[in-house]
Amino acid sequence: MEKMSFGEIFQSIFTPLMIELGVLWQTNSISPSHEHFITSLIKQKIHSLCEKLQESQPTNLDKTYVLYLPDNEIHELGLLYLNYEILFRGYKTIFLGQSVPTASLSNFLEKYEKMVFVSCFTIEPNNDRVEEYLDDFEQEVLAGEGSELWITGYQVQHITNHKNPKIRIFKSSADLIKEL
């Protein structure tokens, strides 16, 4: 493990662990507190690494990443990890976290020229409301030039191609990271 990067550890150890914990939780083999405890430990590590990365000034200034979860979405571990990966590559990030109303995101457009909004749709918006959410996001946030929305997560796996080129759907966090 000493020779593995944090990204390699997250992808090869933490991600499979979290999937297994989810299965154990759904089958009542463990309680929610067990899953929350492990998640909390991983979050602490990611926060610590992000704090260290933010001690240095960003080196890639061509865009700013705003990471958020949509209303009623609370599963932020994947988003925290994406924040780490983006910071690791020298970009400026603004991490907003859980349950952020779409309307509040347009405020950032006044301060930054090129924004990439990043989100993970794990449980919200649910499958039958994703397209409506994307249409609303397009009208409320992406109407101007220079901004994009990058999404990954379970709820967008069924979308093969979105009509707006400013909205990019990734099958996995690893695919999103490759685009950084």
Locate the predicted segments by residue.
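Long amphipathic alpha-helical segments
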Residues: 1-52
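C-terminal regulatory/effector modules of DNA-binding transcriptional regulators
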Residues: 31, 37-180
